[in-house]
């Protein structure tokens, strides 16, 4: 009698739920579920999402029954849905859904049933609840038997058995899950797989969101069971909102002897949230771009300065770093990857490395990328191992099988990996990411597992120099503790230094103080700012991506421009500063990256070829040094940067102006000037010796240093008190009086002569260490000024004299002895010194013997022939 009554109650509930699904209304705010069922069938889905708020308005008893007694109300609701589907399904159009099971999922306001893993209590058992958290683990998808059919060869009969346990939503009472292998007479049974029913089954772990965990406490976790169509809907790292039934099961380790039980959540609906806090309900981190957004994107792309607008709008709270922000924008856009028919893969992702002084906002730029990119994973050098970045072989705690555990770079496939403190990573761990950064795969051959995983991600890393602070007097490779094999894999290497500049420091301090004085709108001064965390009680109400399709018309257009803010518009009193809204920038980047695939035209290809050949073959000028080696990867870098710049313009063709913009950024990142310290030691020696030294000579030397190479080729100015003499490069007919006047003027400022064998040699302060090579040669030729002849005649005389000059053996021995002592001094701290510095230091030694420039050249060439030193291009190298 009780079973008949329960059956009647079940049928009555099925009838009421079916009436609810079939009811019609004129209210535009109420969902018509017959249309929703048709959309579900056309999309090939098997789960209808029902708004529990609308069900509460229709019948309060049904809504309360679903929340408080899901075991009794969910199964009749599923049965009612299957009855409605049977009347609407088309066997021709929906042939793939024939004989499939359909389910009902719930969304809406759950009230006090909206909890998190920390607030779950015993009173929530067997209730319908809603949970928010981060997925930390996903198991393999395995089949679970629901109904098995067995055949007995001895009796020629079929045996049938249904299975039900605590992890199933069915209305059957819990039965034994023992799999039969023989009948009651002991005859063996063989399973008929064609008549049996299996269901996909997966378990995941949901962890409490770290920003919601109390201070000083670890986030808590709970196991979630996914069945049938819900499997593989999430991956580790996703922020999700899961609706389901909170169940208690037997103890997993000690059977039924323990009074404590294992609890799980049987999922009913899974809503993907944004991968970052504060982004709202955005499935899988992908933003929902509306038609209005596309119109605004195309309108903005027609602006000539769209690239500058986008780069300026990135991290507006960070002052300066124009080129670095442009490079980060290109990294977010990415190039175009190539997969050739012969199996070759050419990556399209851009890698960036920032090396520089502490407190230069490197980590803040990484955090901005982490919060802006749709998929980004952050890690640190010390906190990451090689297997943690790539993949590790672990043991499954449920089955004991060996399985692969994906690392950070595999999880960030099609995303960005942010690595801070890159220089602190050990060499063994750093080698593990070589393959990822170029081939973009992870090859594993461990514990009997041999496989290759995709890791198509961009890498942006920050590192500190070897000495803690960047030494501008040393070459870049002496400051960066990374091998060339690693540096060549980074497309751009930026050296960020903390330069001392009064104007820049004042602007920076004003910018930082504005940030500290910033007060959110609606907050009274003096009150603490508390994070509301945007708690979402209406589950799935704003998500239209595969979960709720009823509110598509209610989408709000994303604003394009940022409203005026004293924080973001700092230092913009006189010039109008335009900033784009960061949410609109996210949509613009997502649209350009997914929709635009530019191609190279012939003119751009030739221009890029010329740039690459020029970078490879041109000599470095003056004190310039390369930050990273120039290899064939540099050519691919130019192509990737040009393609990304074309994407920023939403152009389908990479034009020459894109290549010019890429060249500008690459040259900024590639070349670094090395400043050699001024040698003041010899000046002090001359002062101690009692010789006069005019301080105005420092000013004249400084002025000469600041002059550009082009100006020094055409004009050189020498200041001495009130006298200024200008010598043009094409002056060939100066008078002898003017030459004598120049000589006397220089004598009055320089202070000392050293008489050689053929002409008068001036002793100049060392300024050539900071001059470019071409300027150094010009300046050195200016030192040999003959007081009795013109410049042109002096040059010809010096050339003829150099060819006939000879050096006695005694004088050669003195020169070699003096040079041997100099090679051990500070002059050769860089393993080389210019000819002028060497000659000046040799002649400054207190002795009667002096050397002219021509004699020094003859002596150096003879020592070079004896392999004692190397002399080339007026530079002496120590061996």
Curated annotation (Swiss-Prot):
Record keywords, A-Z: ATP-binding, DNA replication, DNA-binding, Helicase, Hydrolase, Nucleotide-binding, Nucleus
Protein name (Swiss-Prot/TrEMBL): DNA replication licensing factor mcm3
Annotated signal sequence range: none
Compositionally biased residues, Acidic residues: 690-713
Residues holding ATP: 356-363
Presence of keyword Isomerase: no
Compositional bias segments (type: Polar residues): 754-778
Species in which this protein is naturally found: Schizosaccharomyces pombe (strain 972 / ATCC 24843) (Fission yeast)
SMART domains named in the record: AAA, MCM
Entry's localization field: Nucleus
PROSITE patterns: MCM_1, MCM_2
Record flagged with keyword Translocase: no
GO molecular function: ATP binding; ATP hydrolysis activity; DNA replication origin binding; helicase activity; single-stranded DNA binding
Catalytic activity, as annotated: ATP + H2O = ADP + phosphate + H(+)
Enzyme category, top tier: hydrolase
């Amino acid at each position: 009698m009780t079973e008949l009554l329960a059956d009647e109650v079940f049928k009555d509930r099925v009838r009421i739920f079916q009436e609810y699904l079939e009811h019609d209304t004129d209210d535009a705010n109420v969902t018509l579920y017959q249309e929703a069922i048709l959309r579900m069938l056309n999309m090939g889905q098997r789960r209808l999402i029902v708004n529990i708020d609308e069900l509460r308005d229709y019948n309060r008893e049904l809504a309360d029954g679903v929340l408080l007694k899901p075991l009794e109300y969910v199964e009749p609701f599923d049965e009612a849905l299957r009855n409605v589907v049977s009347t609407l399904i088309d066997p021709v159009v929906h042939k793939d859904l024939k004989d499939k099971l359909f389910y009902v999922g719930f969304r809406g306001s759950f009230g006090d049933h909206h909890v998190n893993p920390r607030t779950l209590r015993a009173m929530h058992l067997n209730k319908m609840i809603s949970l928010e958290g981060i997925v930390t683990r996903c198991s393999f998808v395995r089949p679970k038997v629901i109904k098995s059919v067995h055949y007995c060869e001895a009796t020629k009969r079929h045996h049938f058995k249904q299975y039900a346990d605590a992890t199933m939503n069915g209305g059957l009472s819990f039965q034994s899950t023992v799999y039969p292998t023989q009948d009651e007479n002991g005859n063996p049974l063989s399973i008929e797989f064609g008549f049996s029913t299996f269901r996909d089954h997966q378990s995941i772990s949901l962890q409490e969101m770290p920003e919601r965990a109390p201070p000083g406490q670890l986030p808590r976790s709970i196991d979630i069971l996914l069945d049938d169509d819900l499997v593989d809907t999430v991956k580790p790292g996703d922020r999700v909102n899961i609706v389901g039934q909170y169940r208690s099961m037997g103890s997993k380790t000690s059977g039924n002897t323990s009074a404590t039980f294992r609890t799980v959540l049987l999922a009913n609906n899974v809503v993907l949230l944004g991968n970052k806090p504060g982004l709202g309900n955005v499935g899988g981190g992908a933003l929902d771009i509306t038609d209005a957004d596309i119109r605004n994107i195309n309108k903005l792309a027609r602006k000539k300065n769209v690239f500058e607008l986008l780069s300026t709008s990135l991290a507006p709270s960070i002052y300066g770093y124009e080129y670095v922000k442009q490079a980060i924008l290109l990294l977010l856009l990415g190039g175009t990857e190539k997969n050739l028919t012969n199996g070759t893969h050419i990556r399209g992702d851009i890698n960036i490395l920032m090396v520089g002084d502490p407190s230069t906002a490197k980590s803040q730029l990484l955090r901005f990328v982490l919060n802006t990119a749709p998929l980004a994973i952050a890690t640190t050098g010390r906190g990451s191992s090689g297997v943690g970045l790539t993949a590790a072989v672990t043991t499954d705690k449920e089955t004991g099988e060996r399985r692969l555990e994906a690392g950070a770079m595999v999880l960030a496939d099609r995303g960005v990996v942010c690595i801070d403190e890159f220089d602190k990573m050990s060499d063994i761990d750093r080698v593990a990411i070589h393959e990822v950064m170029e081939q973009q795969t992870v090859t594993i051959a461990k514990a009997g597992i041999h496989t290759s995983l995709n890791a198509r991600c961009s890498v942006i890393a920050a590192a500190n120099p070897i000495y803690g602070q960047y030494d501008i007097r040393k070459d870049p490779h002496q400051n960066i503790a990374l091998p060339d094999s690693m540096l060549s894999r980074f497309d751009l290497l930026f050296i960020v230094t903390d330069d001392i500049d009064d104007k820049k420091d004042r602007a920076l301090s004003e910018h930082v103080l504005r940030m500290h004085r910033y007060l959110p709108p609606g907050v009274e001064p003096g009150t603490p700012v508390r994070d509301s965390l945007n708690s979402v009680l209406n589950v799935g109400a704003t998500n239209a991506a595969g979960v709720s399709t009823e509110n598509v018309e209610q989408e709000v257009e994303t604003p394009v421009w940022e409203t005026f803010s004293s924080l973001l518009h700092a230092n913009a009193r006189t010039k109008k500063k335009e900033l784009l809204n960061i949410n609109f920038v996210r949509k613009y980047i997502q649209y350009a990256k997914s929709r635009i695939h530019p191609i190279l035209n012939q003119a751009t290809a030739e221009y890029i070829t010329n740039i690459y050949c020029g970078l490879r073959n041109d000599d470095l000028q003056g004190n310039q040094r390369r930050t990273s080696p120039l290899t064939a990867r540099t050519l691919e870098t130019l192509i990737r940067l040009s393609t990304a710049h074309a994407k920023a313009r939403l152009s389908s063709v990479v034009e020459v102006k894109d290549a010019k913009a890429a060249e500008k950024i690459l040259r900024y990142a590639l070349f670094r000037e090395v400043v050699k310290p001024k040698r003041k030691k010899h000046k002090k020696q001359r002062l101690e010796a009692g010789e006069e030294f005019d301080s105005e000579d420092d000013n004249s030397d400084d002025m000469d240093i600041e002059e550009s190479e082009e100006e020094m080729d055409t004009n050189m100015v020498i200041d001495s008190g009130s006298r200024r003499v200008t010598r043009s490069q094409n002056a060939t007919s100066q008078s002898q009086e003017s030459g004598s006047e120049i000589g006397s003027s220089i004598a009055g400022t320089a202070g000392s002569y050293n008489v050689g064998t053929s002409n008068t040699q001036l002793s100049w302060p060392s300024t050539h260490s900071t001059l470019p090579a071409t300027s150094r040669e010009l300046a050195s030729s200016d030192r040999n000024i003959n007081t009795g002849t013109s410049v042109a005649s002096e040059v010809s005389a010096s050339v003829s004299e150099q060819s006939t000059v000879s050096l006695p053996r005694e004088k050669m021995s003195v020169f070699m002895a003096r040079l041997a002592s100099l090679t051990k001094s500070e002059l050769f701290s860089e393993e080389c010194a210019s000819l002028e510095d060497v000659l000046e230091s040799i002649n400054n030694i207190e002795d009667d013997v002096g050397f002219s420039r021509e004699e020094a050249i003859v002596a150096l060439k003879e020592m070079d022939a004896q392999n004692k030193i190397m002399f080339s291009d007026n530079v002496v190298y120590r061996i």
